[in-house]
UniProtKB/Swiss-Prot annotation:
Name of this chain's protein: Large ribosomal subunit protein eL18
Disulfide pairings: none
Alphabetical list of InterPro entries matching this protein: Ribosomal_eL18, Ribosomal_uL15/eL18, Ribosomal_uL15/eL18_sf
GO biological process: translation
GO molecular-function terms, A-Z: RNA binding; structural constituent of ribosome
GO cellular component: cytosolic large ribosomal subunit
Keywords carried by this UniProt record: Cytoplasm, Ribonucleoprotein, Ribosomal protein
Family of the protein in this entry: Belongs to the eukaryotic ribosomal protein eL18 family.
Subcellular location: Cytoplasm
């Protein structure tokens, strides 16, 4: 009798190229693959890996968060903030410090504000010429768990110490907010 081999763990599941058929993205992948091969810098490896990622793993980041992270790192205005994703505007911030940003996408309002305050916006092919090894740059990304879908992940809703949101149709007092959630309806957890 032969032994049945379990092939469950044989395949390594990770992206080696982007799912998207966007030719410009594919060109960037080609460029950063070349850069990593020639420089062996971790910076290029990280950018290459993030270019493969799905849109949900390329979360947007606001201008205020970019400014905050730059300030935390104590970086001057010559440093380039690198985001493999979208940079969005933040209307709550009246003042936008001068900063240089490199991103896959920059929203119209964010672009307007960066340029208005004397900053620069780089594309990734321009960044490859300016900083091929990632010198004088700061890599940053948005919060991946900020999506609404993440509020439903975790311990089952209704279990003690769970803050997970249930998937509900009705949000009234008599439904998921009733038994176990208020002392007037059986008990309160």
């Amino acid at each position: 009798m032969g032994i049945d081999i379990n092939h469950k763990w044989d395949r390594k599941v990770r992206r080696t190229k982007p799912k998207s058929l966007d030719v410009y993205l594919r060109l960037l992948v080609k460029l950063y693959r070349f850069l990593y091969r020639r420089t062996h810098k971790k910076f290029n490896k990280i950018i290459l890996r993030r270019l493969f990622m799905s849109r949900t793993n390329q979360p947007p980041i606001s201008l205020s968060r970019v400014a905050k992270l730059m300030k935390l790192r104590g970086k001057d205005e010559n440093t380039i903030a690198v985001v493999v994703g979208t940079v969005t505007n933040d209307d709550r911030k009246l003042y936008c410090p001068k900063m240089n940003v490199c991103a896959l996408r920059v929203t119209e309002k964010a672009r307007e504000r960066i340029l208005k305050w004397g900053g620069k916006i780089y594309t990734f092919d321009q960044l490859a010429l300016v900083a091929p090894t990632g010198k004088n740059t700061v890599l940053m990304q948005g919060e991946r768990t900020a999506r609404e879908a993440f509020t439903h992940f975790g311990r089952a809703p209704g279990v003690p110490h769970s803050n997970t949101r249930p998937y509900v149709q009705s949000k009234g007092r008599k439904y998921e907010k009733a038994r176990g959630r208020r002392s007037s309806c059986g008990f309160k957890n």
